[in-house]
């Protein structure tokens, strides 16, 4: 195969790979707990896996808590594992109104200046001084995915939600690149409802900014 034909073939393959669907992950309200906070809420009870998530090593746990805010409560909020260094609560704007909490839009882990909340388990309750956020929509990917899609960690991209009958483009989608991540876009339930992302054929693709 001559050089020009090889380059043309490689370019075509890469173009096709760039157009492949990006899996959608709809994040319902959930919590991450530090080992210390977990031990206080579930004393003497090890965290147990209920269902593996797409991202390697991450899972939905059997354990749930109630979120209690100034105006209301949300019950059966799932704990995601493994345990982290700092506790964090991720909710939607709709959830924030139910709870009466002014949760800011943040990337996971960016918790400075965030409001706190009361967590209630079947065994105990604690109050977090901070840690409640509305998660910024984002795409997880490996370095190879980033190379194919021509993006880098920290980029902000536009993404179209397709296959729903009500195509919707989201801008300000953060790119998160890590060697141990698999390609997946994360949106919350408010965003998913707006896009009809619960449709069986729903998927995401990178879109050109307007």
Swiss-Prot record:
<feature type="binding site">
    <location>
        <position position="30"/>
    </location>
    <ligand>
        <name>Zn(2+) 1</name>
    </ligand>
</feature>
<feature type="binding site">
    <location>
        <begin position="26"/>
        <end position="28"/>
    </location>
    <ligand>
        <name>CoA</name>
    </ligand>
</feature>
<keyword id="KW-0862">Zinc</keyword>
<comment type="similarity">
    <text>Belongs to the PduL family.</text>
</comment>
<dbReference type="Pfam" id="PF06130">
    <property type="entry name" value="PTAC"/>
</dbReference>
<feature type="binding site">
    <location>
        <position position="32"/>
    </location>
    <ligand>
        <name>Zn(2+) 1</name>
    </ligand>
</feature>
<feature type="binding site">
    <location>
        <position position="140"/>
    </location>
    <ligand>
        <name>Zn(2+) 2</name>
    </ligand>
</feature>
<comment type="pathway">
    <text>Polyol metabolism; 1,2-propanediol degradation.</text>
</comment>
<dbReference type="GO" id="GO:0031469">
    <property type="term" value="C:bacterial microcompartment"/>
</dbReference>
<dbReference type="GO" id="GO:0016747">
    <property type="term" value="F:acyltransferase activity, transferring groups other than amino-acyl groups"/>
</dbReference>
<keyword id="KW-0012">Acyltransferase</keyword>
<feature type="binding site">
    <location>
        <position position="78"/>
    </location>
    <ligand>
        <name>CoA</name>
    </ligand>
</feature>
<feature type="binding site">
    <location>
        <position position="138"/>
    </location>
    <ligand>
        <name>Zn(2+) 2</name>
    </ligand>
</feature>
<comment type="function">
    <text>Involved in 1,2-propanediol (1,2-PD) utilization within the bacterial microcompartment (BMC) dedicated to 1,2-PD degradation by catalyzing the conversion of propanoyl-CoA to propanoyl-phosphate.</text>
</comment>
<keyword id="KW-0479">Metal-binding</keyword>
<dbReference type="GO" id="GO:0051144">
    <property type="term" value="P:propanediol catabolic process"/>
</dbReference>
<keyword id="KW-1283">Bacterial microcompartment</keyword>
<feature type="binding site">
    <location>
        <position position="84"/>
    </location>
    <ligand>
        <name>phosphate</name>
    </ligand>
</feature>
<keyword id="KW-0808">Transferase</keyword>
<feature type="binding site">
    <location>
        <position position="71"/>
    </location>
    <ligand>
        <name>CoA</name>
    </ligand>
</feature>
<protein>
    <recommendedName>
        <fullName>Phosphate propanoyltransferase</fullName>
        <ecNumber>2.3.1.222</ecNumber>
    </recommendedName>
</protein>
<feature type="binding site">
    <location>
        <position position="90"/>
    </location>
    <ligand>
        <name>Zn(2+) 1</name>
    </ligand>
</feature>
<dbReference type="GO" id="GO:0046872">
    <property type="term" value="F:metal ion binding"/>
</dbReference>
<feature type="binding site">
    <location>
        <position position="193"/>
    </location>
    <ligand>
        <name>CoA</name>
    </ligand>
</feature>
<feature type="binding site">
    <location>
        <position position="186"/>
    </location>
    <ligand>
        <name>Zn(2+) 2</name>
    </ligand>
</feature>
<dbReference type="InterPro" id="IPR008300">
    <property type="entry name" value="PTAC"/>
</dbReference>
